[in-house]
């Protein structure tokens, strides 16, 4: 069972969006590529930051979120995890040079005094672990390990997923 939504816009290449799929062992898997940033923005608003700015330019990248709390500056890149194999989430589900670039930028920013994190929004229920999908893109696994070594935090954001909803329920360190 899938949830497909018709979008009428002359600017689009396609007329429909795949919003969710129903997987027998997992239930609903949210496939909306824009949902992770939306729910993280809502979640960050409840985390006590003094200032939150989406789509922040750092270096040669657009990082998903810039935040401030007191004197401390934060950068967060958001990744939506929709691939599951044997109860484990994997990212990316397709090669992403942009994702590798963002991890390098976060590591550099961390070394310059920012507090940086990459947040994996797990877009399905019952998954509590996300691993780099080195089979699809080994460079992402290397870049993630280097970012962690530089002090970049890895956050796992566990969600409640409905047919047309996604809500962050729990944060864990990855």
Predicted regions and their residues:
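Domain-level recognition of nuclease-like catalytic cores that cleave nucleotide substrates
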Residues: 123-174
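Conserved catalytic cores of phosphodiester-cleaving nucleases, focusing on short active-site segments
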Residues: 63-93, 106
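Basic nucleic-acid-binding interfaces
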Residues: 1-3, 26, 117
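Nucleic-acid nuclease catalytic cores
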Residues: 87-97, 107-136, 158
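OB-fold/S1-family single-stranded nucleic acid-binding modules
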Residues: 10-25, 168-169
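Flexible glycine-rich surface loops and low-complexity tracts that mediate binding to linear polymers
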Residues: 1-11, 158-159
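Acidic-basic catalytic patches of nuclease active cores, encompassing PD-(D/E)XK
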Residues: 25-54
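Short nucleic-acid-contacting surface segments enriched for D/E, G, S/T with interspersed K/R
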Residues: 1-4, 102, 107
């Amino acid at each position: 069972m899938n949830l497909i939504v018709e979008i009428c816009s002359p600017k689009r290449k396609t007329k429909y969006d795949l919003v969710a799929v129903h997987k027998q062992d997992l239930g609903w898997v949210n496939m909306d590529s824009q949902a992770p940033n939306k729910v993280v923005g809502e979640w960050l608003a409840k985390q006590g930051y003094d200032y939150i700015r989406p789509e922040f330019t750092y270096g040669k990248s657009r990082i998903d979120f810039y935040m401030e709390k007191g004197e401390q500056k934060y950068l967060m890149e958001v990744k939506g995890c929709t691939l599951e194999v044997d109860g484990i989430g994997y990212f990316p589900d397709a090669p992403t040079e942009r994702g590798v670039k963002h991890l390098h930028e976060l590591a550099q920013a961390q070394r310059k005094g920012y507090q940086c994190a990459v947040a994996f929004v797990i877009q399905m229920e019952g998954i509590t672990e996300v691993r780099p999908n080195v089979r699809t893109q080994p460079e992402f696994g290397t870049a993630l390990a280097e970012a962690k070594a530089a002090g970049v935090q890895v956050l796992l954001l566990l969600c409640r997923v409905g047919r047309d909803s996604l809500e962050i329920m729990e944060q864990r360190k990855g």
